[in-house]
Amino acid sequence: MSIIFHENTKEFHLTNGQVSYIMEIMENGQIGQLYYGKALRDRDSFQHLHEEKMRSLMAVALPEPSSLSMEFIRQEYPSYGTGDYRMPAVTIQQKNGSRICNFMYQSHEIFAGKKSLAPLPSTYVETEEEAETLEILLHDEVIDTDLVLSYTIYRDYPVITRNVRFFHKGKEAIVLDRALSASVEFNDMEFEMVHLAGAWSRERYVKRRTLEMGIQAIQSLHGASSSEHNPFLALKRPDATEQQGEVYGFSLVYSGNFLAQVEVNTHQMTRMTMGIHPEMFSWELHAGESFQTPEVVMVYSDQGLNKMSQTYHRLYRKRLVRGEWRDKVRPILLNNWEATYFDFDEEKICLLYTSDAADEENLV
């Protein structure tokens, strides 16, 4: 397990032998994504993965001869107003009404272990050797605001976790209108989107749809993640099955309003964004105040949906669940509702409790 920074090419490589995630500091100072998938052997440069080409009517970020367009480049945390017309990960409203922001690389830190996001729930480590973390500090000089992109790669799992933290320094207050937890991009659209939908008493039906140009999304505006959609989606290759093929899983560790969205542009590039739903979200930051997004847990599998599922099960049982009962057999709870509904009295309740078939330790 290691996080490697190549000074000459300004590239970051997160790898643990099971998965690789590679980023770069682009020539305009923003963070670009180069690769996410099966583990690659480290090398001095991954610039062959940087794809840039001229396209009709595109907005170019730098003077000629540059052909860098934010609309057609893979970005780590896209913002509004930089020439990218896809849905952004962040939108910040200033006092004058402007929603344009442009966060540029300032510095980075690599350290062993993983920070807590308390009071937000998040995955954790018990020893620093279990994981390594990269924090990339970005800054927008116009609104005088810092943004920290945080990535943790686990030693024993094909897992990378992500979250974002904002810290406002400017004199005038700003308003976060959109502050998602993660954005991941792919150079093609050859995926099926898998999610879990349903309703009360029939939750979690597996739904699959082939990606099309435009936006496909799941969400909740219930104030909770709800029984209708789990805050999870997977992108699988069309030939992936339970046991073979590539699958990318994305799970938001948050139980409130959420949005999980996949957008395909006109050149068949795919962008997955996930986080707190922007609808009805508006968070004001004054000087010295900060905002922490929830965590997204990303799982890569080259052995189909089953390995992705097993990875989430193992990780969440051991590194999300916590406390006394994590590794203990829990007491049996008998709830009379399914047995009696509203048709109950003292005699029926006592009969349930004393039944030989009931080996319960608690009764509700």
Question: Model-flagged regions — what are they?
Answer:
Residues V262-M272:
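Short, basic/aromatic beta-hairpin or loop at an interaction surface
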Residues F5, K10-H13, Y21, I31-E263, ...:
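Polysaccharide-binding surfaces and accessory modules of carbohydrate-active proteins
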Residues M1-F12, T270-L285:
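Short acidic, Pro/Gly- and aromatic-enriched capping/linker segments at domain boundaries
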Residues F103, W283-D302:
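Short Pro-Gly-centered flexible turn/kink motifs
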Residues L305-R319:
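Terminal connector regions
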Residues Y353, A357-V364:
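Single conserved hydrophobic/aromatic residue that forms the stacking wall/gate
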Residues Q18, V164, G288, L334:
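Conserved, mostly hydrophobic/aromatic
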Residues L315-L352:
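An acidic-aromatic substrate-binding cleft motif
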